[in-house]
Every structure is written in structure tokens, then in C-alpha cells.
């Protein structure tokens, strides 16, 4: 990287460090480590660059960086300390001096208690149990949840783990996100029903399922889990507990705007109300909002797709436009819009299942490159097509699932073929 005097702007150091994640190798690692060790400055550009470097080194899996990252635990930059604790967790640090410092950070640094608990528990530092235990009574949900999860992980006593699920219904969305991570960290499969019902992004729920089940055989995926996955992918609003409510019934204009809310609880609540509104009333404002904004807003994009599939009395003209949107969404490869692809398949299956069936040959040509939730949703959609002749249905499901190595796709296909 260039010297400070050669930088074109304060963000150049940071930008260079961020881009080096794409250049793995010894030279990259040495350059980043040297910056951490020898670049001393109180200016903000150096501080934020060091935070990024610590993250990049961890993502590169650079074990040689542990000594340099560990020294950052004594920094007066709390954000650098936070990133360093996380990085040492990722790199599986076993340096006792650094571990002692992380325990001290937990005792005295109120800004980094959650990440410190997570790190010590993940590294299985048994001597941290007595330090972590009192935090189970913290008034801060994210710290309390991490402590309960950490103690369960370290002691194998899971008695208090269900308490974490209470945080899934807190008004603050970040607290709900923390709760899901805390349940993932302790492999709380018995709390999956609570996770499925939580008003959070479906992506978080999918991650919880995948991390808790790991690479287990499809034979351990039971019908209850498949039913929950079906509800998740089809955005079954009756299965979601919203933590917000309206004082009075809002206008349709207000509800459409709430589909852009960053809190999924509010999005789901708006969806519940809009799904019972007249299709002729809300379609013009939905179309206008989609064209102006929602088509390029990945959160709202998903909510609009779910809404399109939850209303069945669209006019013929409205349906033609909606079908175009759904077909475009199914083939949308932009990473941030991936959760909308499975939702679009299920929405199209509800509104026009024969149109989806016509797409199957094209879909099969790119099946192996599709994300697992999309492949799952295709099988779910065909299975739910009651008017489809049984032999043709089974043929399609077999084609969609043949040689698929994903345990959930396998299990869903087995259920469909057995019915």
C-alpha cells in the first residue's frame, strides 16, 4: 500500500485493504500485517483501515497474523478491539496472553462484552465460565443471550437456553438477530419453531436451519421441519409473530410504504393488512411503487413478490404485469435479490401453476447453479399443484431432484414422491 502522503484521499488506505481480500497470498498477508505492526497514527483513516485489515486477515485465514492482531486487543480504539476479538475467534487463537486479555476485556469493557463472550465460548475457554456466568442476568438482551448461550456451550447445561427465544419477540430487530445467532451458537434445534415464527428476514432463518443441521443425512429431516420450511418459503404470514401493531387500520398508501421498512416485523404486519385489501384498490399504487423504487430495493422487492402471491383476485390485466415481474425475478441473478427468486417461484405457482410447469425444461438446464432454496421451492410448487397428473408430477419432481446432494431438497422430494 502507498504511504500516507501518497494517498489521494482518506479512504484510499481502507479501499486498498478491502480490495486485498481478492488477492490471497503471502505478499498480501505480509503487507497487511506490517501495516498493523508499524503504522501508528491517531488519524481516522488509519484507524478504520486497521479495523478492516484485521477483518481481511481473519477472512483470509492468516494464522501468522495472530500475534499482530492480538496486540490490537490493547488498543484504545474500541472498534478495533471488537474486530480483533472476532478475528481471533475465527483464527482459533490459543495464545494464553491474548485469551487472558479477552477475559479482562469482558470484565471492564462494556462496549465489547457480547463479542468477548462469543469468542471465549467458541474457543472453549473453560476458565472463562465464572466470568461469563453473571452476564446471564444482564439487562441488555444481546449480552444476556450470548451469556446463556456461552454457558450452555461451555458447561453442556442447556437448561436456560429457551430463555434466549424470548428475545425473538423483542421490539428491537437487532436483539432478534442476536437471539438467532445465540441459538445457532448452541445448536438449539429444539428452538427452531420459535426461530421460524420470529419476525426477521427469511435469510436468517435459513442460515439457522443450515448451521444447526450441518451436513446431516436427509433421513434426519422430519416432516415437521419440512412443513416449517414450506411455510417459510411461501411466506405464510399466519406462522409469523409480529411484535408491532397499528393503533388503527392504516391507509393502503401507508401500508405500501411500510413494505420498505428495515424492520421485518413491520413489513410482515403491512403484508398481513395488504393481503386482505381489495386487489383493484392496491394494484395501481403497488405498480407505481414497484416501477419507481421497489424493483431495485431488495427488501421491498421480496415483500412485493410475497404480496403478489398472496392475493388471488387480481384482474387479468394486473396478472399479466405481475407474471412479467415474477418471471423476471426468477431469473434475476443479482446476489442481493436471491431470496426473491424462490418467493417468485411460489407466487407464480399459486397464481398460474401451468405457467411454472412450462418453465421446467428451461429451469432444468440451469438447475445445478440455482441456490438450494430455489430448488426446494420448485419441488414444493410442483407437489402442491393438485390438478397435475400424478405421473407427470412425479416425473418433474424426480428431474428436479435427481442427484441433488442437498439434504433438504432430497427430503422434500422424498416427501413429495411418497404422497
From Swiss-Prot:
SUPFAM superfamilies given in the database record: ARM repeat
Superkingdom assignment: Bacteria
TM ranges: none
Name the UniProt record assigns to this protein: Bilin biosynthesis protein CpeY
Phylogenetic lineage: Bacteria, Bacillati, Cyanobacteriota, Cyanophyceae, Synechococcales
UniProt keyword annotation of Hydrolase present: no
Keywords, sorted A to Z: Antenna complex, Phycobilisome
General function of this protein: Involved in the biosynthesis of bilin.
GO cellular component term of the entry, any: phycobilisome
InterPro entries registered for this protein in UniProt: ARM-like, ARM-type_fold
